[in-house]
Structure formats: structure tokens, C-alpha cells
């Protein structure tokens, strides 16, 4: 048996190929699997459970079907932090806190989306702190739908523009932040996404950091079992 992790799919109506690949993943890859964890940014943008493009309904049905076979867990990303209990219930998913610790086949593990670890990106961290305020979420959720969609479009454009000007180092996780979280959670292993830089990093004191891949050019999943960990590429259309 194994546990699977995916993240950073950035599903949208503009990329039906990614949606189809994820549907195929749900249909073919969940055999001999104890649980599926989605580590955020399942969608390119999510402005509220009351707004969903038509393609989302097919995803809801597929995730719900998967959840009838095994537990499906979700941690919010920076693109879909407004996914709420209503949508999760439709999918049969369990929403997890921003940072979650678990035992994976005898290895103490902490999982998260990963954006909180990019502490050198000061401007983003300031925005993130504002965005996570309860009053800010409430205010945004009560704006007209057209207003929310407009704000989301402007934020995406601003993010793309600013990221082009930021260095590789600033946009990656900060090593001290990684070790601080491992120490705070008393865990040996960390699994996250966000950076789109899949890899398995061996750290000091026998600890390990694993980054799941994005789904822009191909699918990607992390398989964890009693035998170890494996990052697996999932080419589209195969």
C-alpha cells in the first residue's frame, strides 16, 4: 500500500488537457492506495464556493467517486485559499489545516502547501498575512461575483509580472524556515509544493524535504510507502 501526494495542478477552463490528465489520474492511479493528499493550488483561481466554471462539476464527480474508495485530504494553496467546507463536502474531501503532521509508515512527517516557507519574498508574505485575516476573507466573500473575478484577474497579472523580476532564491523556500518548522513539529520529513521544483532534499540530522511537482507540462505525483518515496512523472495523453 502507498499514500499519494499531488499539488499545483492549477486547473482552469483554459487548460482542458490538465483537467483530463487529472481525471485519468483519479481513475487509474489510486489502486493499492491508503489516502490521497492534494497540497493546494488544485485550481488556478478560486474566488468562492458559489462561483464555479462548468468544468468544475466533472471534477467534483470524479473526486467524490475517489473519496468513496479512500480518504481524500486537501490543504489550501495560495491560488485556492477560498475553497470552503461547502465545496469540500461536495467532493468528499477533508480540509486540513495549513500545516499538518502525520505518521507516514513510521516516519514523522509535516505537510503543507509551501508558500509560507518562502520567507525571503517579503512583499508576498505581507500580502499573505493580509489575505489570511478572517475579516479580509469575509469581506472578499461578500463582494459581488463580478467584483471578485475582477480582483482575482488583477492579482494574477500582478503576480506574474512581479515574479518575472524576482530572483530564483527569493522565490524558493528559505532553509532556516524549513528547519524551524521541522523542529517545531518534531518531524523528520517535510512534503510540500508551491515552488514547482520537484526534488528530494536530504537535510541535516537525517531529515528530508520532498517537493511535489506541478502539472504544467506533465502530471506529477509523490508515492510514499513502507519501501520509501518516489517522485513519478505522468506524461499527458499516456
From Swiss-Prot:
| Residues at which Mn(2+) 1 binds | 8, 10, 41, 196
Pfam families, sorted: Metallophos
Which positions are annotated as binding Mn(2+) 2? 41, 78, 113, 194
Task of the protein: Hydrolyzes the pyrophosphate bond of UDP-2,3-diacylglucosamine to yield 2,3-diacylglucosamine 1-phosphate (lipid X) and UMP by catalyzing the attack of water at the alpha-P atom. Involved in the biosynthesis of lipid A, a phosphorylated glycolipid that anchors the lipopolysaccharide to the outer membrane of the cell.
Descriptive protein name:
UDP-2,3-diacylglucosamine hydrolase
Q: List the subcellular locations.
A: Cell inner membrane
Topology term for the membrane = Peripheral membrane protein
Keyword vocabulary terms for this entry: Cell inner membrane, Cell membrane, Hydrolase, Lipid A biosynthesis, Lipid biosynthesis, Lipid metabolism, Manganese, Membrane, Metal-binding
Q: Which InterPro entries match?
A: Calcineurin-like_PHP_ApaH, LpxH-like, Metallo-depent_PP-like, UDP-diacylglucosamine_Hdrlase
**Which source organism does the UniProt entry give?**
Shewanella pealeana (strain ATCC 700345 / ANG-SQ1)
Gene Ontology terms: biological process: lipid A biosynthetic process
Task: Give me the residues that bind substrate, please.
Answer: 78-79, 121, 159, 163, 166, 194
Q: What does the cofactor section's free text say about binding?
A: Binds 2 Mn(2+) ions per subunit in a binuclear metal center.
